[in-house]
From Swiss-Prot:
Residues annotated with Phosphoserine modification: 249
Provenance organism: Bos taurus (Bovine)
List of residues that carry Phosphothreonine: 52, 500
Gene: DARS1
Catalytic activity: tRNA(Asp) + L-aspartate + ATP = L-aspartyl-tRNA(Asp) + AMP + diphosphate
Protein name: Aspartate--tRNA ligase, cytoplasmic
Subunit structure: Homodimer. Part of a multisubunit complex that groups tRNA ligases for Arg (RARS1), Asp (DARS1), Gln (QARS1), Ile (IARS1), Leu (LARS1), Lys (KARS1), Met (MARS1) the bifunctional ligase for Glu and Pro (EPRS1) and the auxiliary subunits AIMP1/p43, AIMP2/p38 and EEF1E1/p18.
Keywords on record: Acetylation, Aminoacyl-tRNA synthetase, ATP-binding, Cytoplasm, Ligase, Nucleotide-binding, Phosphoprotein, Protein biosynthesis
Region (Binding site for the 3'-end of tRNA): 411-415
Main location: cytoplasm
Residues that, per the record, bind L-aspartate: 229, 273, 427, 431
Keyword Coiled coil set for record: no
Amino acid sequence: MPSANASRRSQEKPREIMDAAEDYAKERYGVSSMIQSQEKPDRVLVRISDLTVQKAGEVVWVRARVHTSRAKGKQCFLVLRQQQFNVQALVAVGDHASKQMVKFAANINKESIVDVEGVVRKVNQKIGSCTQQDVELHVQKIYVISSAEPRLPLQLDDAVRPEVEGEEEGRATVNQDTRLDNRVIDLRTSTSQAIFRLQSGICHPFRETLTNKGFVEIQTPKIISAASEGGANVFTVSYFKNNAYLAQSPQLYKQMCICADFEKVFCIGPVFRAEDSNTHRHLTEFVGLDIEMAFNYHYHEVVEEIADTLVQIFKGLQKRFQTEIQTVNKQFPCEPFKFLEPTLRLEYCEALAMLREAGIEMGDEEDLSTPNEKLLGRLVKEKYDTDFYILDKYPLAVRPFYTMPDPRNPKQSNSYDMFMRGEEILSGAQRIHDPQLVTERALHHGIDLEKIKAYIDSFRFGAPPHAGGGIGLERVTMLFLGLHNVRQTSMFPRDPKRLTP
């Protein structure tokens, strides 16, 4: 007589066979073979951002990540994410989906990439948790293209939760080090996607605006023979049998191009600063947007060109990137960025007067500290209602050796900084174009003349008066969006404590 276990097994086997036979949808789901460019099908993949009520009733294919999944009886709800856009998808037992298919969909690991065929359906009630609120996708086929590991180093929902909400409701948030240690995952969040898409909207109009103004884009060396500004804050690298340095700035080469009659130049490239500054706004490597321009009579001609370029960028961001701005503001609320036309320009002595009136004690030739910069930004906002302004005529003592002195006041200089929300984003000046004067100033700063001989020599054969400045891309992005740490706007940040990933 057969045992009870044997009898049970004999009953289960036909049931398994029957269940398999009932899986009428087995060809409609599964794990796809690895894509190795074996074929090029005619299948058209639709962007999630294009899934609107106008497509209701259409059968579409979508490739996306599984953001969340929730099984409920004979159906499973998925949220499919594609960059900063997402849509709800429904897998329900019916003509196109079996119980096994619903179970398969419910067990797909978060962040896996899937190909989904489905019918776009208009919903009666808006889906508030998705960007595509008026439609959902009724799934007919689903295939895993690339599976994610079941345990994620961070949860994306936690990574986009506002800190205030986390504190008030006791819900999880993700700290900065965890984000940066797992940057590839963190960059998938809707906030990160929005930040870096907006950042690309800074570089493009910078290049386009200046090109339309007659500027020439140049590339300058990053490996140089001497500290580019004569300071100690440089990275030393082995260069065959000698030492070389990573450029702190393209400054000297921009000027040499002006001496070579390019007249107006700009460059976009990495800048290296060996500063042991673990602050919210300092990086050891960042992207510099640099401008240099010959002028006719006054360096303010250049100041106005730079300010106009930045204003054009701000206008473009506010016009073209409202979705991204709103996405970032959901997690990091901030007042809209304000600016004036023409740009407000104050002299350094006026700024000192405002600070002194607010109770700050400062000497006439003292540089602005970070707290005083921020205070000045608040005072300017209160008085002029702008987040963007220019500070002109800095003390000569706090500027680099190549800065032109003010002819009316030897303690001042023809130099300027530009500020956003009370923080400096550009430093610039009229450059000394006379070889004798630049030699005197270099000696005054203790710079070895032999190491900048090529630079000084470039002025010996006739040099036009010129000025320029350097902008930090990550800092502009941070301040435009009202963020509080430049690491949020650097894709893979480098600071004194971080060299990976």
